[in-house]
Amino acid sequence: QAYDKSHNELKASYIEIDLQRTKDGHLVAMHDETVNRTTNGHGKVEDYTLDELKQLDAGSWFNKKYPKYARASYKNAKVPTLDEILERYGPNANYYIETKSPDVYPGMEEQLLASLKKHHLLNNNKLKNGHVMIQSFSDESLKKIHRQNKHVPLVKLVDKGELQQFNDQRLKEIRSYAIGLGPDYTDLTEQNTHHLKDLGFIVHPYTVNEKADMLRLNKYGVDGVFTNFADKYKEVIK
């Protein structure tokens, strides 16, 4: 339902999917490695089978935390699999997918690429037009994907405070496999944004929820932002 709202109502540019994997090997969309925060369950996603995960209520927490945006229909929402999302929105939607470190879920990258291929999202036309972007904080995960398919656009996520530690050698090494950089928005200045663009990166900061920050970052020249308020950002870029 969150994906329906962002895709159908708010017309967000991309459907963002954070991937975890169940005990029986299914890729599912969930931000955290545990189910504690966003369901009525406890423990790690990898300790649940898909059937067990589907028993959990993944919607009521949102109604409680964000009463202003609450909907009765969110109650008992189910955790979707990657395949269910790709099936629902089809090959013409845009997907921005985050992988974890390979040591958390070994083989996740191969699985993800197999799913994207099955849903006709890996043909060169789709990739050239940016229908799929894959991001990760893990260099190794991105490198694994790049080794398997060098046409998939990759974005290196950067922890808060880390960007300032990157010298040009490090940035160029990242640029050898990733087309984009995803820093915490508070780490961007006009100067370092221009420098990243000069090195050939697209720049997609996270998570920008205030209009003033959106305006400032657009002035710096970012290529887009991650936000919880796609409608607000659409007003800014009109």
Can you annotate each of these PLM segments?
Residues Q1-K238:
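Phosphate-group recognition and catalysis centered on beta-loop-alpha active-site segments
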